[in-house]
Amino acid sequence: MSLERAVRAKIASKRNPEMDKEAQEWIEAIIAEKFPAGQSYEDVLKDGQVLCKLINVLSPNAVPKVNSSGGQFKFMENINNFQKALKEYGVPDIDVFQTVDLYEKKDIANVTNTIFALGRATYKHADFKGPFLGPKPADECKRDFTEEQLKAGQTIVGLQAGSNKGATQAGQNLGAGRKILLGK
């Protein structure tokens, strides 16, 4: 198998149809429109118009001009504008897909992961009341301990690995018992 074919097979194996469906249903719920029947998930997203509608619902006027015609470069501009708006909305840069992942269908799983990252980012916007996608991100819960509390913690046997009962060697026998005979 050629290297290129192996890479394509690996990328295709990352794709989860259930996640694609969940992302599609979430997008449809947010923009209040169904995807056209008979078109695949990636084909609907390819021109970037649906993605721009999505971010404009979540963050009004995030993408002021959505290109509905004009060819490949205008559609790629839609995708780039969507990506820029994602970062401004709070999606980490590491979670944002590359334009070719969608437009050339190189890594649709990465596109779906970006949509899930956007779904997680909606939790951080108190004004968003719509349906959420993905798990709620954890909030930082910083603790401040006094020196006395830290010293007291050093004397306690940690129970992270289970119980500290039976932590002695009493009753442990391995192999035959040893007899020490003196004077023979």
UniProtKB/Swiss-Prot annotation:
The record's CDD domains line, in alphabetical order, gives:
CH_dMP20-like
Q: Where are the Calponin-like repeats?
A: 157-181
Descriptive protein name: Muscle-specific protein 20
Q: Keyword Acyltransferase, does the record have it? A: no
Check the record and name the PANTHER family matching this protein.
Answer: CALPONIN, MUSCLE-SPECIFIC PROTEIN 20
- State the Gene Ontology BP annotations: actin filament organization; myoblast fusion; regulation of myoblast fusion
GO cellular component terms, alphabetically, are:
actin cytoskeleton; cytoplasm
What is the top-level taxon of the source organism? Eukaryota
- Tissue specificity as recorded in UniProt: Found in synchronous muscle; not found in asynchronous indirect flight muscle.
Designated gene of the protein: Mp20
Q: Name one GO molecular function term.
A: actin filament binding
Kindly give the InterPro entries that the UniProt entry links to this protein: Calponin-like, Calponin_repeat, CH_dom, CH_dom_sf, SM22_calponin
Query: Which keywords does this Swiss-Prot/TrEMBL entry list?
Result: Muscle protein
Family in the record: Belongs to the calponin family.
> Where's the Calponin-homology (CH) domain?
17-122
**Species, as recorded:** Drosophila melanogaster (Fruit fly)
